[in-house]
């Protein structure tokens, strides 16, 4: 039971950090390359 409580308290923190960093990354990409349909660093 204690392991379940530990998991339920750790998982929301990790998902919040993950989605927060993902949102920040997407915001910075859109700031550097506004309205880009093809990103320059993906083209070969």
Curated annotation (Swiss-Prot):
Matches recorded under InterPro entries: PSI_PsaJ, PSI_PsaJ_sf
Pfam families hit by this protein: PSI_PsaJ (PF01701)
Entry keywords, A to Z: Chloroplast, Membrane, Photosynthesis, Photosystem I, Plastid, Thylakoid, Transmembrane, Transmembrane helix
Annotated localization: Plastid, Chloroplast thylakoid membrane
Record's bilayer topology term: Single-pass membrane protein
Transmembrane segments: 7-27
BP-aspect Gene Ontology terms: photosynthesis
Chief location category: plastid
GO cellular component: chloroplast thylakoid membrane; photosystem I
Family: Belongs to the PsaJ family.
Biological role stated in the UniProt entry: May help in the organization of the PsaE and PsaF subunits.
HAMAP family: PSI_PsaJ
Name by which UniProt lists this protein: Photosystem I reaction center subunit IX
């Amino acid at each position: 039971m204690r392991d379940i409580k530990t998991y339920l308290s750790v998982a929301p923190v990790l998902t919040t950090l993950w989605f927060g960093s993902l949102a920040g990354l997407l915001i910075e990409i859109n700031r550097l390359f506004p309205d880009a349909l093809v990103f320059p660093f993906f083209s070969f």
